[in-house]
Each structure stands twice: as C-alpha cells, then as structure tokens.
C-alpha cells in the first residue's frame, strides 16, 4: 500500500474528530502565524499536511487572504473542501507527497506543519523536506513546525515517528533556517491520552 493509499484509507474510515491529532481549534499554530506575519493578512501561507484540520478555516476567518494547503490524501482534501463550502475556492490546494511536490519557488512567507515532519523516519526524506521548505519559503520567512516532543509517542496512526527536542530540530534545518523560538505543549487526544508536542519557529536565512 502506498503512502497516499494509506492516508486515503485513514480519512475514509475515521471521523475527523476521532484521529489522535484532532483538535477543535489550532490556537497555538494561529497565534504563531499571527506573530511571524506581524498580522499581515496578505502574507502567503501554506499548510503542509493540512488533512481535515481547521487551520485554513481559522485563518480565513481571521482575514488572511493568500492561503494554500497540501496533503498527500485526496480524500482529506475533498472533505476539507466540502467542510469549507464556497470558501474552498479561496484556498490553493495541492494533493501531493511533500517530499516530491512541485511548489513555486520563494512563494511563501509561512510554511506551517503540524504533525507531518515527524513521520519522516528516513534521513533522505527529511533532507527532501528541508529542501522543499528552503526553496518555497522566501528569505526572512518562517517555518512553523509541530512535531512530537522528546517525551511524545513512538508511533502515530500505526506508523513510527521521530521525536525531537529543539536542538535536534534546529540541527536538521540548520543549513537554511535558524531556530528563533520553541515550546513544548501537551495535546489531549479524543481518547483522553496526553501527547507531548514541540512547537518550533524557524526563520529562513
């Protein structure tokens, strides 16, 4: 089964509020995006691994006008478009694997990723991811990234993950980005379990 087939099956068979990473609002992500854009509502923003999360909904409601979303699952994108209704036309959609996606160069001020990067357990895939972010984010722009923290789970959705502290994450991105901020946050899953996330802000050099 390919990665795309795997994630299509996840989004076909599980309710949006039943997956472990579900949160009714992505308040930390929105707050960090507001901060790094200095509330510039025309800042180009892309959400990597958008899934069925409500980040684009929240950013649209907050007045941001240049939004894109990427996910490997066409099923997730279709459901997000349905949820948004006519507003989905105000978002640019990419159905692709982030390690091989074709993205415009120097296009984005903000690259947001909540819970994709930690699934990249092989170094070549991480290197492709960093290269994609380097090429797509404008110098001075930011990556807002959330991964499992050092005490986070070892698996998610049945797949292995890599846990990070801020020093480890900074080292992975060091050739093109500098870490400017990080914080640990506990996420409560729909099943009531606690998962530790690391939120990091990295500035494009």
Which residues make up each language-model segment?
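Class I (Rossmann-like) S-adenosyl-L-methionine-dependent methyltransferase catalytic domain
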Residues: 1-106, 120-136, 142-205
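Short catalytic micro-motifs in class I SAM-dependent methyltransferases
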Residues: 115-119
């Amino acid at each position: 089964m390919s990665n795309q087939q795997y994630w299509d099956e996840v989004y076909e068979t599980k309710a949006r509020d039943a997956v472990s990473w579900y949160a009714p609002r992505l308040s930390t992500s929105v707050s960090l995006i507001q901060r790094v854009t200095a509330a510039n509502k025309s800042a180009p923003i892309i959400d990597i691994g958008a899934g069925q999360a409500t980040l684009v909904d929240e950013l649209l409601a907050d007045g941001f006008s240049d939004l894109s979303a990427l996910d490997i699952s066409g099923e997730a994108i279709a459901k997000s478009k349905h949820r948004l209704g006519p507003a989905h036309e105000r978002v640019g959609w990419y159905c692709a694997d982030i390690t091989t996606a074709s993205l415009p160069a120097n296009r984005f001020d903000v690259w947001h990723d909540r819970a994709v990067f930690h699934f990249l357990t092989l170094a070549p895939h991480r290197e492709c991811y960093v290269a994609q972010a380097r090429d797509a984010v404008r110098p001075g722009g930011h990556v807002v990234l959330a991964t499992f923290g050092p005490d986070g789970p070892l698996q998610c959705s049945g797949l292995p993950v890599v846990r990070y502290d801020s020093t480890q994450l900074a080292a992975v991105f060091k050739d093109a980005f500098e870490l400017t901020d990080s914080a640990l946050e506990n996420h409560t899953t729909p099943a009531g379990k606690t998962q530790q996330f690391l939120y990091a802000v990295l500035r494009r050099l």
